[in-house]
């Protein structure tokens, strides 16, 4: 089963072959887990695969995605897990987990909860025998919502900017809605997630920015002709400040 795979900005990066922007799509996620105070505790590269990929070597896409997470893992002193789950099944009872980026072990979903608990993440007592892959969410994400409880913050990494040596320098959170470029501001209810990503960037000597573009539903149009940039720094007041509005060409060259 395939989930959210792309957006207009990703498609432009691909079509223009922009080398300094990196991202994962399809059934792959680069995740940051933290406590209720938005303190990062764990990094995860999670991927839904089919039967033939389940025990296969890392793909080139995997290697690049894990490489970026490994960099911030090293510089932030945060552990990194790699998790594979079957996305071609209606339900899953196990996953593959690697805690060293090399060797996978099969674990039940109850054991997966224990692994997360080992890294000081709160785990609920919800039964964890099996979880469904459905049209709106993967079995892994359904497990996450059910078993990690409300005392966590979690965010996926939308977009990286790397330098000429491939070292990550900026993480972007991509936001889209029907609000005009001039009107939109980050919503207060998202601040905990913003703080989580910023904290990871701060530990890793990177910048964190929010990139916003207008997207309408009726008719559907993902308008990336203009992209509004906000800088995020929770050591300052205000912690989120409007920076500039780029044309798509300027953003590609940013």
Where are these regions (language model features)?
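Conserved catalytic cores of phosphodiester-cleaving nucleases, focusing on short active-site segments
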Residues: 11-14, 18-21, 25-65, 157-161, ...
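Nucleic-acid nuclease catalytic cores
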Residues: 70-96, 198-227
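Acidic-basic catalytic patches of nuclease active cores, encompassing PD-(D/E)XK
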Residues: 1-36, 73-78, 85-155, 203
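An interfacial alpha-helical scaffold signature
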Residues: 106, 165, 183-185
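Short, charged, amphipathic alpha-helix that recurs within catalytic cores of restriction-modification
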Residues: 54-83, 183-203
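Charged phosphate-binding loop/patch that engages nucleotide di/tri-phosphates or the phosphate backbone
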Residues: 244-254
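Short, electropositive alpha-helical surface patch
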Residues: 100-110, 221-246
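Intrinsically disordered, charged low-complexity linkers and terminal tails
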Residues: 54-59, 145-147, 154-156, 217-218
């Amino acid at each position: 089963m395939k989930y959210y795979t792309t957006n207009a900005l990703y498609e432009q990066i691909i079509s223009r072959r922009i080398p300094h922007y990196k991202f994962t799509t399809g059934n792959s996620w680069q995740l940051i887990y933290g406590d209720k105070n938005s303190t990062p505790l764990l990094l995860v590269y999670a991927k839904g695969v089919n039967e033939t990929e389940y025990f296969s070597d890392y793909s080139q896409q995997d290697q690049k995605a894990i490489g970026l997470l490994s960099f911030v893992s090293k510089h932030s002193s945060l552990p990194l897990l790699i998790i594979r789950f079957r996305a071609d099944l209606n339900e899953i009872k196990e996953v593959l987990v690697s805690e060293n980026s090399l060797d996978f072990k099969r674990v039940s979903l109850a054991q997966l909860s224990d692994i997360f608990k080992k890294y000081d993440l709160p785990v609920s007592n919800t039964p964890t025998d099996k979880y469904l892959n459905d049209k709106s969410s993967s079995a892994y994400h359904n497990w996450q919502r059910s078993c990690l409880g409300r005392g966590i913050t979690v965010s996926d990494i939308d977009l990286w900017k790397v330098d000429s040596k491939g070292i990550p320098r900026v993480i972007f959170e991509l936001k889209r809605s029907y609000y005009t470029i001039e009107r939109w501001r980050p919503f207060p209810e998202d601040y905990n997630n913003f703080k989580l990503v910023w904290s990871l960037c701060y530990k890793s000597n990177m910048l964190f920015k929010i990139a916003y573009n207008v997207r309408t539903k009726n008719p559907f149009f993902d308008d990336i002709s203009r992209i509004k940039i906000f800088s995020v720094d929770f050591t300052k007041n205000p912690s989120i400040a409007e920076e500039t509005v780029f044309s798509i060409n300027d953003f590609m060259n940013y």
